Amino acid sequence: MNTVVSLFKNNSDIDNLRDSGYGSAAFEVIKTPMYFRTADGSSKEVANKDMYFRADTGDQLAVHSSKYKMVTHQSMIDTARKVLERSQLNLKDIKETIAVGDSGGVCFVRHQLPNHQIETPDGDTAIMELLHINSHTSVWPYQATAGANQNACTNHQVFLGEIAAIYKARHTQSLDVDRGANLMNKIMGVMDEQNNIWGRWKNTNVGLKEAVRHIATATGSKVALDLLDKDEDFSSIMEVPAVYNNSSFMYVMAKYMGHYQKKMGSNYWAVYNALTDWATHHTGTRSNTIDLPISQVKRSEKIQQTIRNFSIAS
């Protein structure tokens, strides 16, 4: 009897994930030539164009050139698991969450690593969280980023862009798995580095108008920004319909003033937590259903851009 012994210490933890399958990404993608209907009612093939759609639902995912090489979400998930398996990270009790957005056109895989944990500046704990993204629509390249999940509020904590990025590739086929694992190993010190920044944010006071400016920037409230530039007072700004009808802006302001500012003080740490609360939990007020997985990532990217402008205490 031949016994195969894995060379990777994380093999059993990753095998447990493999046994769980691909979740909502477990669907086949079919490619077909693209046609258009002519004036006389006949069909004609569009040169060098293919359409991709889900075999189970028929939803169209993307249109690409005939030379395009589609990478399935299952392939991305396999690659992410292989990278983690070869890394030196402690994967005991790892939790994997698979979600798709845009009717299946985009896939997000989050891995939470409870054995990589820190204490945040306000005494909460946060565990390392890794995010892998694959897109059939070319909205995002295949990428992996680091973040954290705060235990008390379950916010997905966004890291500064230069700290968060692990690797990007046009396709999973372009990524050397062993190189990816080596890059993954470098994030073991990332949480401490980011936590030091969080500590400086907690020690940096922020005025109300400055907090409003950062919140308006992240949530796209251009009217609020214009009024701030005109030195309008806070109460007047909040009475403008174009401001209070922005549900994202109002959500963050309510979270900041009603919870995080009271709990953490008037500082950048409180502003940051209000923003990550919005990125993680806000579902909007429109009647149409929000695509939460895509929304969470897009909001996180906006937060990354905003926090670059935080003035940090020395």
Task: Identify the residue ranges that each predicted region occupies.
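Feature for intrinsically disordered/low-complexity regulatory segments and propeptides
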Residues: 1-79
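Intrinsic disorder/low-complexity polar-acidic segments
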Residues: 79, 85-314
